[in-house]
């Protein structure tokens, strides 16, 4: 059983935070990962910063800009994972990358590199499901999970994607880019139920989740939540503290407290 399979096996209320590699700087990204595991994260989603992030709203776009100031590349982002492991990170790491940098690097080469660096899965939001055969084969060869992203589209397409999902199915709570939302789309529950009827792996939901009430409401039909913009926004607000070695501990504590309050039942 892989590290990811072990993490999700029979577990409810999975918490999957998203952070951007290199934000606010590479060293603090490692500290953030460790802090998030301490706060209760089951899986870490690590975003590769990119200059043209189609699925990301302004909060995560700003995080990419902060990371790119440190010349964070796909290779450098991947290399953070073994450093996290060396400092005690035990949870699975899913790498979130867009298709252009992936193709420039080479799909098979990227997967091999990710496996060498102890990554557990890959998520490519702008790669159509039908075009993922090369990536799927490479992931299978190197024992990585290719995470399926499912949007509220036709039932036939949902069934096709959910049935072939690995690790977990990542459901998009609403169409559009990532970002904080005051209210979730009321149709999300029906959508999650549809996905669950076809999936043999846990069903998690992301995009727009930022409050404990939303986490609690989604627990009825989802096996877990992905929280990105709310955490990344806080990282941006605490940028000065996190970049100051004397204030770093206080900044990390504030993030841990926010996450603990978000997922406490």
UniProtKB/Swiss-Prot annotation:
One of its GO terms (cellular component) is cytosol. Pathway: Amino-acid biosynthesis; L-tryptophan biosynthesis; L-tryptophan from chorismate: step 5/5. Coiled coil: none annotated. GO terms for molecular function: tryptophan synthase activity. The active site is at 45 (proton acceptor), 56 (proton acceptor). InterPro entries: Aldolase_TIM, RibuloseP-bd_barrel, Trp_synthase_alpha_AS, Trp_synthase_suA. It is an enzyme of class 4 (lyase). CDD domains: Tryptophan_synthase_alpha. Pfam families: Trp_syntA (PF00290). Keywords: Amino-acid biosynthesis, Aromatic amino acid biosynthesis, Lyase, Tryptophan biosynthesis. Tetramer of two alpha and two beta chains. The alpha subunit is responsible for the aldol cleavage of indoleglycerol phosphate to indole and glyceraldehyde 3-phosphate. This is Tryptophan synthase alpha chain. It comes from Halalkalibacterium halodurans (strain ATCC BAA-125 / DSM 18197 / FERM 7344 / JCM 9153 / C-125).
């Amino acid at each position: 059983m892989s590290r990811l399979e072990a993490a999700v096996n029979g577990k409810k209320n999975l918490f999957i935070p998203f952070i951007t590699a290199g934000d606010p700087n590479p060293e603090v990204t490692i500290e953030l990962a460790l802090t998030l595991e301490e706060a209760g994260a089951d899986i870490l989603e690590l975003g590769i910063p990119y200059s043209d992030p189609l699925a990301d709203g302004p909060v995560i776009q700003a995080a990419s800009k902060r990371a790119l100031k440190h010349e964070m590349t796909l290779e450098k982002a991947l290399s953070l994972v073994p450093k996290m492991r060396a400092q005690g990170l035990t949870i699975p790491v899913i790498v979130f990358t867009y298709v252009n940098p992936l193709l420039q690097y080479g799909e098979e080469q990227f997967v091999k590199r990710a496996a060498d660096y102890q990554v557990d899965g890959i998520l490519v939001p702008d790669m159509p499901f039908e075009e993922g055969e090369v990536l799927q084969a490479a992931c299978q060869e190197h024992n990585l999970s290719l995470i399926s992203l499912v949007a509220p589209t036709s039932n036939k397409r949902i069934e096709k994607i959910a049935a072939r999902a690995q690790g977990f199915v990542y459901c998009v709570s609403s169409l559009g880019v990532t970002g904080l939302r005051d209210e979730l789309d009321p149709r999300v529950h029906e959508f999650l139920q549809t996905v669950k009827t076809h999936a043999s792996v846990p069903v998690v939901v992301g995009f727009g989740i930022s409050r404990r009430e939303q986490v609690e409401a989604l627990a009825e039909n989802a096996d877990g939540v992905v929280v990105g913009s709310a955490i990344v926004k806080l990282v941006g607000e605490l940028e000065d503290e996190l970049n100051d070695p004397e204030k770093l501990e206080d900044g990390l504590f504030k993030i841990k407290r926010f996450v603990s309050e978000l997922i406490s039942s």
